Amino acid sequence: MIQNIVTSIILYSGTGVDLLIILMLFFAKRKSRKDIINIYLGQFLGSVSLIFLSLLFAFVLNYIPSKEILGLLGLIPIFLGLKVLLLGDSDGEAIAKDGLRKDNKNLIFLVAMITFASCGADNIGVFVPYFTTLNLANLIVTLLTFLVMIYLLVFSAQKLAQVPSVGETLEKYSRWFIAVVYLGLGMYILIENNSFDMLWAVLG
């Protein structure tokens, strides 16, 4: 259980670094109590929706009879990790700045939409393979851990928005942290499902 919690924390942290920077932008510009509450609600709405969508995909994929074939899903986070290393991470920060410039009144929807636009594909590509490796008990622990991490992510962004230099440092090094988490998760999924033999057979 402890290993499951630690893995979930690392995984969510890897997918949440981009969002941390984006949320810091919102908190730097929107400082009223109502706006702060709406940022929290928007982030929960966007993130929980992505997690729910990932669960649906994982549920369908669990009907694949071969564990080794299912394990090949680990290639998705490996691909995403290599993409981050070579091309950089998402353009969510630019989308957030554009949304703030337009002074969008529906802040909840704006934050949720940016969560989807900036992290949707990556999060689903990482969460789905991981969810397929979990039994029901570990899945429940993971989901509860994710909910706590969503809150901690927004809370951290709210506090760090008061220290501009932190945002610059995160932006500079985030791609390396994200890439390591994605690549590590992909390797873990391949190993956990004994998929390397099948992979070598296909490549050979």
Can you say where each PLM-predicted feature lies in the sequence?
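Juxtamembrane boundary at the C-terminal end of a transmembrane helix
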Residues: 188-204
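Membrane helix-loop-helix hairpins that form the core translocation module of multi-pass transporters
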Residues: 33-98, 156, 170, 187
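Final/C-terminal transmembrane alpha-helix of multipass membrane proteins
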Residues: 175-193
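Interfacial loop-to-transmembrane junctions
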Residues: 158-180
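Core segments of transmembrane alpha-helices
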Residues: 51, 116-126, 178, 182
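Small-residue-enriched transmembrane helix starts and helix-helix packing motifs
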Residues: 1-17, 94-118, 140-144, 148, ...
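Transmembrane alpha-helical segments of integral membrane proteins
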Residues: 23, 149-164
